[in-house]
């Protein structure tokens, strides 16, 4: 395709060249301009080809393969899935047999992962939200449940059937009835329970909560100090709106958001009336301290982690080691084959183990909140020549995060990241994957780099053409 377009382009350039060469004046400058145009056309063609290849990289494997190869792939994946879930499907008291994920479901999950990675916040919200409430005035508003919110930021979590982009469960507004259903959406001690009378998440809430989850604690501390003009450690509502507006503009979600008046997903204010009441009281004249806000961030992280834990259907308060491993690797970006292999090895090693409690899981994720300090501490150990074994990890957790990691949690982590089986941690890979897990993938740019590439190409073409036309003396 690019060759066919290239031939007439060259012919046109040749004709223009002959025309320019017929004129004696400024021949050298014109030749430079022609060379610049030729280089620019070549660069655009090559870059377009690379972008086309990148955009269709995932689709090529399914398009170009023959039906026979596709069928064999399906059979192989189904067989692998059956092997992986064989132990989980053993009859147990009070546990429902889990349905096996099929070939079609995997393709749907791949599509939904691309929505999470590259779509605008507006589209992500409209795809994963499941409720549409019609008010007495006839106006409607779309809401997420807490489970929808967790699903929207967790890879490989499939949206329920018949619910997708602009497909919702319709509810007529009845304040008393909906408020009575609040317990279905969140526990009374949950942050989500405080989101309005319904305990549901609006679009403004969604943007605010993703901002809180994707921003390190240190960034909020600095922003609060910048707007705390009198130094008393408190900010009012207007100052806090400025703080969170600046923080939001630095996140990938905030940079990608554009108000959509047609869908109603606009940010008229920084956050909803329910959250303003939560932070500043009913009269909105209260003050918010950095301590109280960081406590809100901690509780939000706790509630989201609890929902993730419960999605694995714990038995007697325990999830399997393989399920814990999948939580750790959910945002790793590891290739599917390698990921499947790592989880299989984990399952074989802990086939008859007792599993992990939520307290053990939460302690490890508290350890991850200090991952930058952990990275520094492990680097000191490495430079000192000490091995990064389980005892070292437990010591770092006690020193840096003030938590106690159980021996069993350390065994599972080392089973995942001890690549050569010598009982020592692969520090570089562990830290890189855990940083991605901590931010839940929300810090990644929500685009494929096309706009940035085109801007760089345009700037390069301008500078190149100028250098050819006006060479330095």
Swiss-Prot record:
Cite the binding residues for Ca(2+) 2: 418, 420, 422, 424, 429
- Gene3D superfamilies recorded: EF-hand
Q: Where is this region: Polybasic region?
A: 96-107
Family annotation (SUPFAM superfamilies): EF-hand
Q: How is this protein annotated for GO cellular component?
A: mitochondrial inner membrane; mitochondrial intermembrane space; mitochondrial membrane; uniplex complex
Identify the stretch(es) annotated as K/R-ring: 123-126, 256-260
- Quote the entry's note on domains: The EF-hand domains have high affinity for calcium and act as sensors of calcium levels. Lysine and arginine residues in the K/R-ring mediate electrostatic interactions with mcu and play a key role in mcu inhibition in absence of calcium.
For this chain, the family text in UniProt reads:
Belongs to the MICU1 family. MICU1 subfamily.
Name-wise, this protein is: Calcium uptake protein 1, mitochondrial
Source organism per entry reads Xenopus tropicalis (Western clawed frog)
């Amino acid at each position: 395709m690019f060759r066919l377009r290239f031939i007439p382009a060259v012919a046109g350039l040749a004709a223009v060249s002959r025309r320019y060469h017929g004129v004696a004046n400024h021949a050298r400058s014109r030749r430079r301009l022609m060379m610049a145009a030729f280089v620019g056309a070549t660069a655009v063609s090559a870059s377009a080809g690379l972008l086309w290849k990148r955009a269709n990289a995932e689709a090529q494997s399914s398009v170009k393969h023959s039906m026979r190869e596709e069928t064999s792939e399906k059979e192989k994946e189904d067989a692998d899935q059956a092997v992986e879930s064989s132990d989980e499907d053993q009859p147990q008291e009070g546990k429902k047999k889990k349905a096996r994920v099929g070939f079609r479901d995997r393709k749907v999950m791949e599509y939904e992962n691309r929505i999470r990675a590259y779509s605008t916040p507006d589209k992500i919200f409209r795809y994963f939200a499941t409720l549409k409430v019609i008010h007495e005035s006839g106006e409607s508003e779309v809401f997420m449940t807490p489970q929808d919110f967790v699903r929207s930021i967790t890879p490989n979590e499939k949206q329920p059937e018949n619910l997708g982009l602009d497909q919702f469960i319709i509810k007529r507004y009845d304040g008393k009835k909906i408020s009575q259903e609040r317990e279905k959406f969140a526990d009374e001690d949950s942050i989500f329970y405080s989101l309005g009378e319904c305990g549901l998440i609006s679009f403004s809430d969604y943007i605010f909560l993703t901002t809180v989850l994707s921003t390190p604690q240190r960034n909020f501390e600095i922003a609060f100090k910048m707007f705390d003009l009198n130094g008393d450690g408190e900010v009012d509502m207007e100052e806090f709106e400025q703080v969170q507006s600046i923080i939001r503009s630095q996140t990938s979600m905030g940079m990608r958001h554009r108000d959509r008046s047609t869908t109603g997903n606009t940010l008229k204010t920084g956050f909803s009336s329910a959250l303003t009441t939560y932070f500043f009281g009913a009269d909105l004249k209260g003050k918010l301290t950095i301590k109280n806000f960081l406590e809100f961030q901690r509780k939000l992280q706790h509630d989201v982690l609890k929902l993730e834990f419960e999605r694995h259907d714990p038995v007697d308060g325990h999830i399997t080691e393989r399920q814990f491993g999948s939580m750790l690797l959910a945002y790793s970006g590891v290739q599917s084959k390698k990921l499947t292999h790592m989880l299989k090895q984990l399952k074989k090693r802990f086939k008859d183990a007792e599993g992990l409690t939520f307290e053990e899981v939460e302690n490890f994720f508290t350890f991850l909140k200090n991952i930058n300090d952990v990275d520094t501490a492990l680097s000191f150990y490495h430079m000192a020549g000490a091995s990064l074994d389980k005892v070292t990890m437990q010591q770092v957790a006690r020193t840096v995060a003030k938590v106690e990691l159980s021996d069993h949690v350390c065994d599972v982590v080392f089973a995942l990241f001890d690549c050569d089986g010598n009982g020592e941690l692969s520090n570089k890979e562990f830290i890189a994957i855990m940083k991605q897990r901590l931010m839940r993938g929300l810090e990644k740019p929500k685009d494929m780099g096309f706009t940035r590439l085109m801007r760089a190409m345009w700037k390069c073409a301008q500078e190149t053409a100028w250098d050819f036309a006006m060479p330095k003396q």
